Each structure stands twice: as C-alpha cells, then as structure tokens.
UniProtKB/Swiss-Prot annotation:
Subunit structure: Part of the ribosomal stalk of the 50S ribosomal subunit. The N-terminus interacts with L11 and the large rRNA to form the base of the stalk. The C-terminus forms an elongated spine to which L12 dimers bind in a sequential fashion forming a multimeric L10(L12)X complex.
Record-given protein name: Large ribosomal subunit protein uL10
Domain of life: Bacteria
InterPro entries: Ribosomal_uL10 (IPR001790), Ribosomal_uL10-like_sf (IPR043141), Ribosomal_uL10_bac (IPR022973), Ribosomal_uL10_bac_type (IPR047865), Ribosomal_uL10_CS_bac (IPR002363)
Family: Belongs to the universal ribosomal protein uL10 family.
GO molecular function: large ribosomal subunit rRNA binding; structural constituent of ribosome
Organism whose genome encodes this protein: Vibrio vulnificus (strain YJ016)
Keywords for this protein: Ribonucleoprotein, Ribosomal protein, RNA-binding, rRNA-binding
Function: Forms part of the ribosomal stalk, playing a central role in the interaction of the ribosome with GTP-bound translation factors.
GO annotation, biological process: translation
PANTHER family linked: 39S RIBOSOMAL PROTEIN L10, MITOCHONDRIAL
GO CC, one annotated term: large ribosomal subunit
SUPFAM superfamilies, per database record: Ribosomal protein L10-like
Amino acid sequence: MALNLQDKKAIVAEVNEAAAGALSAVVADSRGVSVDAMTTLRKQAREAGVYMKVVRNTLARRAVEGTQYECLTDTFTGPSLIAFSNEHPGAAARLFKDFAKENKKFEIKAAAFEGALTDAEVLATLPTYDEAIARLMMCLKEASAGKLVRTIAAIRDQKEAA
C-alpha cells in the first residue's frame, strides 16, 4: 500500500513521540512468523506497556533521528519491528526474548538503552521495580541479621575472656 507524504509524516511523528518517552528500544525481524503469533505478541506488548510497530526502514531512521535511539539507524535493514518500553527498560527485550523461544524464525536484531546499543539478553534480565526493591530489602535484612550474629559472637567472646 502506497503512503502519501502526510501519512509518512504522521508515522514518523508517532514513532518519534514513542521514542522520546521510551526507556529502551528493541528492533526485531519478524519474517516467517504467523499472523496469529504476531497478534498474540501485540496483545502481550500492550499489556506490558510496550509500544510496537512495523515501520519502513527510511521512516524508522527519520523517526529516531535526534532521539537517544539514533544508534539503531544501522539496524534498520529488511523488515523491522520496533518496540519501545514505556514502563520498564527490560519489558520489550523480555517480551521479544520469550517470543523468540517459541518462534524460531523471530530474530532480535538489536537493543538500545540510554543512547547506546546493548545486548538484548542483558536488558531482558533486568529486574522489575518490585524485584529490585525485594532484592534490596533482602540485602538489608541479611546485613542486619549478620550484624546481630557478630554482636552476639563478640559478647560471647568477651564473656569467655573474662
């Protein structure tokens, strides 16, 4: 389907707006993936707060121009599916990684975080906000328990020395 200039400008503006407010971006090649599988992926993306769109490469290059995802311009070759994480930096990468396990033809091309290309595996393994808080609380709890054990051991040693 041919797009006129106004449609192209609208697509570039839409993707640029999504890129401006995103925490991370992932580019993938979805050739050979069934329509049903892609529909499921789009539904999961909406639920995870991920903006996802198939965009022509020239329009994608123009859309990310001047944003922190300008580093992705070289990856826009062949069919490109671009996803921007809005709520959590690892959401799109985690979604694509899980989807690629089920669909062997789905290939993750690149990922970007804070203006630099990043390994999608690293982005996918980032803990969510709740997981990070839980880990922090666990560390604090272990530290205070360890301090208590050392204090009791010091008191025991003092009594033995006396």
